[in-house]
Swiss-Prot record:
Family indicated by similarity: Belongs to the UPF0519 family.
Native source organism of the sequence: Dictyostelium discoideum
Name of the protein described by the UniProt record: UPF0519 protein D
Length: 70
């Protein structure tokens, strides 16, 4: 059950970051500046990388807690 909770909370984090990224992109497109759009894409890459790491840690933590019976 812990794994399911971890994954569902990760989905919420992911959706929140997507909303923030979309807001970032909409601001950059309104400026019509290619540099701003590229900067936003770099930030998106960093966010997705962090999300992958957090996702992996949450799954490992879920497996450890379920195996120890906590």
């Amino acid at each position: 059950m812990t794994i399911i909770n971890s994954i569902s909370s990760l989905g919420k984090i992911s959706n929140k970051n997507k909303i923030q990224t979309n807001l970032l992109n909409s601001k950059n497109y309104s400026n019509n500046s290619p540099n701003n759009i590229q900067g936003s894409n770099e930030n998106t890459g960093i966010v997705s990388g962090v999300l992958i790491i957090v996702g992996g840690l949450a799954i490992v933590l879920g497996l450890v807690t379920s195996s120890t019976g906590l």
